[in-house]
Structures are given as structure tokens and as C-alpha cells.
Curated annotation (Swiss-Prot):
<comment type="subunit">
    <text>Homotrimer.</text>
</comment>
<feature type="binding site">
    <location>
        <begin position="9"/>
        <end position="11"/>
    </location>
    <ligand>
        <name>4-CDP-2-C-methyl-D-erythritol 2-phosphate</name>
    </ligand>
</feature>
<keyword id="KW-0479">Metal-binding</keyword>
<feature type="binding site">
    <location>
        <begin position="57"/>
        <end position="59"/>
    </location>
    <ligand>
        <name>4-CDP-2-C-methyl-D-erythritol 2-phosphate</name>
    </ligand>
</feature>
<feature type="binding site">
    <location>
        <begin position="35"/>
        <end position="36"/>
    </location>
    <ligand>
        <name>4-CDP-2-C-methyl-D-erythritol 2-phosphate</name>
    </ligand>
</feature>
<dbReference type="InterPro" id="IPR036571">
    <property type="entry name" value="MECDP_synthase_sf"/>
</dbReference>
<feature type="site" description="Transition state stabilizer">
    <location>
        <position position="134"/>
    </location>
</feature>
<feature type="binding site">
    <location>
        <begin position="101"/>
        <end position="107"/>
    </location>
    <ligand>
        <name>4-CDP-2-C-methyl-D-erythritol 2-phosphate</name>
    </ligand>
</feature>
<comment type="similarity">
    <text>Belongs to the IspF family.</text>
</comment>
<feature type="binding site">
    <location>
        <position position="11"/>
    </location>
    <ligand>
        <name>a divalent metal cation</name>
    </ligand>
</feature>
<dbReference type="GO" id="GO:0019288">
    <property type="term" value="P:isopentenyl diphosphate biosynthetic process, methylerythritol 4-phosphate pathway"/>
</dbReference>
<dbReference type="InterPro" id="IPR020555">
    <property type="entry name" value="MECDP_synthase_CS"/>
</dbReference>
<dbReference type="Pfam" id="PF02542">
    <property type="entry name" value="YgbB"/>
</dbReference>
<feature type="binding site">
    <location>
        <begin position="133"/>
        <end position="136"/>
    </location>
    <ligand>
        <name>4-CDP-2-C-methyl-D-erythritol 2-phosphate</name>
    </ligand>
</feature>
<comment type="pathway">
    <text>Isoprenoid biosynthesis; isopentenyl diphosphate biosynthesis via DXP pathway; isopentenyl diphosphate from 1-deoxy-D-xylulose 5-phosphate: step 4/6.</text>
</comment>
<comment type="function">
    <text>Involved in the biosynthesis of isopentenyl diphosphate (IPP) and dimethylallyl diphosphate (DMAPP), two major building blocks of isoprenoid compounds. Catalyzes the conversion of 4-diphosphocytidyl-2-C-methyl-D-erythritol 2-phosphate (CDP-ME2P) to 2-C-methyl-D-erythritol 2,4-cyclodiphosphate (ME-CPP) with a corresponding release of cytidine 5-monophosphate (CMP).</text>
</comment>
<feature type="binding site">
    <location>
        <position position="140"/>
    </location>
    <ligand>
        <name>4-CDP-2-C-methyl-D-erythritol 2-phosphate</name>
    </ligand>
</feature>
Length: 158
């Protein structure tokens, strides 16, 4: 049996925080605002996995009203999500992710992100694709006010 999940997330850029995307710290003058470390890509991946497994979303599992998740490492949240998926008897087929950001440039960090996501999903890096695009300076991402990400995941019974 195959199941497909889709994830989407957005975070505002702000001063005074590190920029962590896909589990990788990226040198930049701003970081993403959020209750956890605000890793927009790992949140998207986690949401896609939860959706595919029929287990809701990250807000259900890690509410931003719970102090336990204040400044949480999103990689640890992803590992927790993947354990839920595994307990239901699924393995990763593949995942395709898109980061939507005007800046900074993501290309130098894509390979490291793929490896980190593969690690979190206990998969081979060949099963993980990450790409980035801009919105040609249109909208909040185009004005560099925030960063968005989306992902589609395929899981299958082990």
C-alpha cells in the first residue's frame, strides 16, 4: 500500500536568530521566527509525513503553546514523527521538497540538507530531493520577509 502526503510551511525572517533550513545552519543576517528553531523545511517534511500516515499535523503533535517545544530542534521533532510513521509499518518511497526564498541562495546547502533529511527519515539520500526557487521578487518571499517550503512524500508498507 502506498500513501502520499503533502506539507507546506512559512516562517517570517527576523533579526537575532540563526537561519536553520533542512537541519543546516545557513550564514545569513536574519533567521526564521518561530516557537521552535523555525526550520521551515523540516516542518514541511514532518507535516507531509504525518499527512501520509493519517496522523494530523505538527501543530497537533508539537503545539506552539507547549513550553516543552520552545526553541526545539526540528530535527528531533522530525525523528519523532518518523517513529510514528514507522510504527504504522511504513518506509519512505521518496520525498520531493521545494524551498521558496528570494535570499539567501540555497544551492550551496542543498546537498547537506538532502543528507540531513535522509538521516531523519532513515533513508538513502537518493530518496530525497530538495530544490529551491524564488518568486521573482513578488510577494512576501520575494521581498525577503519570509521563507516558505513545500514537500510531497510517498510512503509504502514495509
Amino acid at each position: 500500500m502506498f500513501r502520499i502526503g503533502q506539507g507546506f510551511d512559512v516562517h517570517q525572517l527576523t533579526e537575532g536568530r540563526p537561519l536553520i533550513i533542512g537541519g543546516i545552519e545557513i550564514p545569513y543576517e536574519k533567521g526564521l521566527l518561530g516557537h521552535s528553531d523555525a526550520d521551515v523545511l523540516l516542518h514541511t517534511v514532518a507535516d507531509a509525513c504525518l499527512g501520509a500516515a493519517g496522523e494530523g499535523d505538527i501543530g497537533k503533535h508539537f503545539p506552539d503553546t507547549d513550553p516543552e517545544f520552545k526553541d526545539a530542534d526540528s530535527f528531533k521533532l522530525l525523528q519523532h514523527v518518523w517513529n510514528i510513521v514507522k510504527e504504522k509499518g511504513y518506509v519512505l518511497g521518496n520525498i520531493d521538497c521545494t524551498i521558496i526564498a528570494q535570499k539567501p541562495k540555497m544551492a550551496p546547502h542543498i546537498d547537506a540538507m538532502r543528507k540531513r533529511i535522509a538521516e531523519g527519515l532513515e533513508a538513502d539520500v537518493s530518496q530525497v530531493n530538495v530544490k529551491a526557487t524564488t518568486t521573482e521578487k513578488l510577494g512576501f518571499t520575494g521581498r525577503a520577509e519570509g521563507i516558505a517550503a513545500q514537500a510531497t512524500v510517498l510512503i509504502q508498507k514495509a
